[in-house]
Amino acid sequence: MSDDVDSETRSRTPSISSRQFIIPEDELATLDSENSSLDSGGEEASSGGSDAYSAAGGSTPVFSRLGQHPSTFFTGSQVAPIFDTSLYLFESLTQSLDSVDFSEALSLQTKTSATINSKSRELQLLVGEVQTHLRRLQTAFEQGQHTAQRVRHNLRDITRGVESLKQTFARSYPIEYHQALERAYERRAE
């Protein structure tokens, strides 16, 4: 319901007037008369844009230069280009790739690359050394495990032997065994 009301109250005209962007007819007539005077010179129009611009009045505004050859876009004839993009790109690249700056950047990049390569080699050597050291430690650890298992097994056997000897002495020599135990407890108490 609200959409119906909004559509009835809204204006269907564009919000921006296109008349603001139209070139007035008196300026078009001025541009056409300048074009005809430049084209009537024959060789003057085809000799180059800078000669035509200087002959047309020295330092003309940029906007008047843009309208000098309006028909070249539509007809496809190349009398004098408005803006030579390839020349502009070439000149900007030439300025940006100044030989001194380029050689300095190239030497800096070479030095940086050499530093990175040397550090990479050092790192690879260190990794190799650490891996060999790790292998040695792993073998030493495995040998230590085997030794610890042997010692644990031997201690278990010795403990069983001592317990069996205690029981044998306690049965065979009870008086001496208890006297020896009392002495041992007295030593611990001191």
UniProtKB/Swiss-Prot annotation:
Localization: Endosome
Stretches with biased composition (Low complexity): 36-56
GO biological process terms held by the UniProt record: endosome organization; regulation of protein localization
GO cellular component term, pick one: endosome
Superkingdom, natural source: Eukaryota
Pfam families xrefs: KxDL (PF10241)
Chain ranges passing through the membrane: none
Chain spans, region Disordered: 1-56
Disulfide bonds: none
Quaternary structure, from the entry: Component of the biogenesis of lysosome-related organelles complex-1 (BLOC-1).
Function: Component of the biogenesis of lysosome-related organelles complex-1 (BLOC-1) involved in endosomal cargo sorting.
Family: Belongs to the KXD1 family.
Protein name, entry field: Biogenesis of lysosome-related organelles complex 1 subunit KXD1
The species this protein was found in: Eremothecium gossypii (strain ATCC 10895 / CBS 109.51 / FGSC 9923 / NRRL Y-1056)
Taxonomy of the source species: Eukaryota, Fungi, Dikarya, Ascomycota, Saccharomycotina
